[in-house]
A protein has these predicted regions:
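Non-catalytic regulatory/linker segments of enzymes
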Residues: 1-149
């Protein structure tokens, strides 16, 4: 199946960007199991390239780990951070979780690890969990401030 997926990947849009990206990557990611997918994502999507550069250890994990397990862990982390954190910390944690989920789902989708139905379900699950964590945080804050009893 990997050959079929590789055949469907678009070539990187900018080889110079891909070379600079690969030079900046740690060995674990640069020499990982899917250099074709890594190059395709880095060369075609500045957003995904930026996410991989920002957290190369997570990116390396996203290429090899079970995507469902990683998504479960991201969502569980959202639930935990909504408990007792200040607004700034909660917002930062939510942005970090969004970035990780976006990268993970993109890799699972373009790498052929998830069919469209699973990609859509993962996006929906993450959106639901993010919204629930935000509502929980807001309700706790309102209660703590005496605006909600």
């Amino acid at each position: 199946m990997s050959g079929e997926i590789t055949a469907r990947l678009p070539p990187p849009l900018d080889d110079a960007v891909v070379r600079r990206f690969r030079d900046a990557m740690p060995d674990a990611l640069r020499d990982g199991p899917r250099p074709d997918l890594l190059d395709g994502l880095a060369g075609a999507s500045p957003y995904l390239r930026g996410l991989m550069l920002a957290d190369p250890d997570f990116a390396a994990e996203a290429f090899v780990a079970n995507p469902q397990s990683v998504l479960d862990r991201i969502i569980a982390g959202l639930r935990m951070v909504a408990d007792g954190t200040c607004q700034t910390d909660f917002m930062a944690a939510l942005r970090t979780a969004k970035a990780k989920a976006a990268l993970l789902i993109a890799i699972a989708d373009t790498g052929g690890r998830w069919p469209l139905a699973e990609v859509t379900a993962a996006l929906t699950r993450f959106a639901d969990a993010s919204l629930q964590a935000a509502v929980d945080w807001l309700l706790r804050e309102a209660h703590a401030a005496g605006r909600l009893v």
